[in-house]
Amino acid sequence: MREMSNLFKSTTNGFIGKLNLTLEQKTVIYDALKEIKKCLSDVIFKEYEIHPRYMTQGSAGYKTQNQPCHLSQEIDYDLGCYLPFSDIEETGKPYRAANVFFNTVDTALEELAIKMHWNGVCKEKDSCCRVLLTNNIHIDIPLYSVPDKEFQTIHECCDSFRKSISSAESYDIEIDEESWENFDYDEVLLAHRTEGWKNSDPRKINMFFQMQFKMKGEQLKRICRYLKAWRDFKWEEGGPTSIYLMCLAEDLFDAEDVFGDDIKLLEILRKMPERLETPVLNKAESEELKMKNSDDLRLLIEYSKLFSQDLNKAISDTTISDKTACLLIQDHLGVRFPIEESLPEKNISEKIRSIPISTVNTDMPLARVRVG
């Protein structure tokens, strides 16, 4: 049996290292965040006498952010902007129209983008303001409303930022401006460009994954990143969402595997087809997650079968060379997966055989040509 775990998880020469953002990219994001927060804090306070709070959300908050695979894909950073409102109508919605705040924020960001020589501002997203920093990096800024009395429980210090960011090197551990535990509120509303204010609480899913990563370990986080990178390679556009893949991985992940990331990934892939026969749930919200494209579910099942078969062959088949084994995995993850011509061995044949195998239905053709 081949030892391939380090080819996945090494931050220097492994696959995960290729997925990490570069220091240059982190610096671009870090510098932009400082400018955006200062700009919005000044404009919103001047206009409404409100001090907004900010929270890193999404993949940047989960620490599962990946380098894009294709030129058409982008690095996405989500920065939630939280605003307090004491004036609530009988409907329970802030009296200020959501589009008023969109207009204020859009205008401020457009002026900032010109000043900073960024690529501009996109207003096509109904649920956020999007700042285009470069051709492959953007920052999404959803606007939230929290009842005023509950908003006061969010701790404020150091110019509205709980944690200071000293350098781009500290990006991964100090980028959060507040801790989710400090958000003590019963209701949060998301501004929508066409539908006004909608109930939406990003805290639930963020805290759920923080807890799962803490309980189940860093291997789960890496597995989530491998699956997202696999998705990005197979679907240049569309495909299962990151939340879908992360919830699926968490559901299939029982505990860390001492035999390594290669074996754990194989286990997840082998279990996936049967698990996908029933709905995948967002446990934080107790709701079913659905594919935007109905064909994507079938493709995900077929891709997982093909990947698990090739990964099993790469690990177990001693008749092929180590280079060929790596090339088998590249068929599913792309050239970012490293090629090594001399790999160590490990004796885990019983472990491999104990993992249930799903077979590929070769009678049902794939409806979409696989990327790569």
Model features per residue range: what roles?
Residues 138-214, 367-372:
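Extended, alpha-helix-rich binding/interface surfaces that flank or overlap catalytic cores
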Residues 57, 61, 130, 145, ...:
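Catalytic residues for metal-mediated phosphoryl-transfer on nucleic acids/nucleotides
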Residues 74-78, 126-128, 136-140, 168-170, ...:
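Extracellular structured ligand-interaction cores
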Residues 72-74, 247, 255-256, 260, ...:
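Acidic, low-complexity intrinsically disordered regions
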Residues 1-75, 81-100, 371:
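N-terminal regions immediately upstream of nucleotidyltransferase
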Residues 209-320:
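Conserved nucleotidyltransferase catalytic core and NTase-mimicking acidic/glycine-rich helix/loop elements
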Residues 1-16, 277-372:
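Terminal (often C-terminal) interaction modules
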Residues 27, 40-44, 62, 95-162, ...:
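Conserved catalytic core of two-metal-ion nucleotidyltransferases
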